[in-house]
Design a protein with these regions (language model features):
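Conserved acetyl-CoA-binding loop-helix of GNAT-fold acetyltransferases
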Residues: 92-106, 130
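Active-site beta-strand termini and strand-to-loop segments that position acidic
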Residues: 63-65, 150-153
């Protein structure tokens, strides 16, 4: 299975809505609003694309074998690089190679240490150590607890 990366705006809004409203996806995104409407999703897409201009890096939409699979990439969170990956459940087995691809690009993007924040509902985290991440603690965001993992630069 091959994957390709795209601007968020390359993906039709209804496909984004399907991802952002998917119950299995929402279960692992405690800050998500399952009631997205088209206008809110369009604004969100525009803001994600704007991160490339604002930060020199940002998230990208992911297609696997030409099909929209989700999104991933580096975002700014409290002045640090935070990696996020959100995939439709059918593509959850592709996460490792997608993370490895993004991590291989961090030097060209000027990124050193990278964090991953996961909700405690994510029980399977051992794979992160194989990708160079170590658990370094917990953080609270908008009243929700997240496990913090870091990969040094």
């Amino acid at each position: 299975m091959g994957f390709s990366l795209h601007a968020f705006s390359d993906i039709p809004i209804p496909q984004w809505m399907a991802l952002l409203r998917h119950p299995d996806v929402i279960r692992h995104m405690p800050l998500a609003d399952p009631n997205w409407d088209e206008d809110a999703v369009a604004e969100w897409v525009q803001a994600k694309d704007a991160q490339w201009v604002d930060n020199g890096h940002g998230p990208l939409a992911i297609r696997v074998d030409g099909h929209f699979a989700g999104w991933g990439g580096f975002q700014r969170e409290d002045g640090e690089a935070d990696f996020a990956l959100v995939l439709f459940p059918a593509y959850w087995g592709q996460g490792g190679r997608i993370v490895r691809h993004f991590m291989s690009r961090r030097a060209e993007l000027g990124l050193e240490a990278v964090n991953i924040l996961l909700p405690p509902s994510r029980l399977r985290t051992r794979g992160l150590s194989r990708l160079g991440f170590q658990r370094v603690g917990e953080v609270m965001l908008d009243g929700q607890r997240f496990l913090k993992f870091r990969s040094p630069g």
